[in-house]
Regions:
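...with weaker cross-activation on analogous glycine-rich loops/strands in unrelated enzymes
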Residues: 2, 59-126
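Short acidic, gly/pro-rich beta-turn/loop elements at beta-sheet edges
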Residues: 19, 111, 126-127, 133
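A residue-level signal for beta-strand positions that form part of recognition/binding surfaces
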Residues: 6, 113-114, 135
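N-terminal capping segments
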Residues: 1-62, 142, 146-147
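Helix N-terminus capping/helix-initiation residues
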Residues: 24-25, 66, 131
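Short glycine-rich loop/turn motifs that provide flexible caps or phosphate-binding loops at active sites
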Residues: 13, 19-20, 97-100, 117-118, ...
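Intrinsically disordered, low-complexity, charged/polar segments
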Residues: 127-147
Length: 147
């Protein structure tokens, strides 16, 4: 059985950035859960999405707009379970850039990849495939994340 936050995240699939001078109010709501509190939907928002989803369950997220902030949240787990917060490197494993989303399982089309439900994946909430070699860590809530 998937954790509650996966059900919440799945209901957000399809929310996307608005091109031009307007902003998607839902993405701005995601941003409101971080200290950055960005005012535009073009500002990277993968961590904001994870913070928002986690907050909907009554847990406390990182409050950071940085994807890599999740590497210090909860407890690390060696083997991912559905719903595990998954932190992925972007430019290089040592860069500060990253991506974060929720682990859904192995990619059925390529066993060297995983499926991640996340925000700001091609400017929308979606399910995307990532190479497992790019995973920096899988995280799970601990008692410290209770609000």
């Amino acid at each position: 059985m998937a954790p509650l936050w996966i059900d919440i995240a799945k209901k957000e699939i399809g929310n996307k950035e608005i091109t031009g001078g307007k902003d998607n109010p839902r993405i701005l709501e995601y941003h409101s859960t971080t200290l950055l509190k960005a005012k535009h939907d073009e500002v990277p928002w993968c961590s904001a999405f994870v913070n928002w989803v986690i907050s909907q369950t009554g847990l406390k997220g990182t409050g950071s707009a940085s994807a890599r902030s999740w590497l210090k949240w909860g407890k690390g787990i060696a083997e991912p379970a559905v719903g595990a917060i998954t932190v992925i490197w972007r430019t290089s494993p040592k860069s500060r850039e990253g991506h974060v989303g929720f682990y859904l399982g192995p990619d059925p089309n390529d066993k060297s990849r995983i499926l991640v439900l996340g925000g700001n994946q091609k400017d929308r909430v979606s399910i995307a495939s990532y190479e497992t070699s790019r995973v920096l860590g899988y995280r799970w809530p601990s008692v410290n994340e209770a609000v």
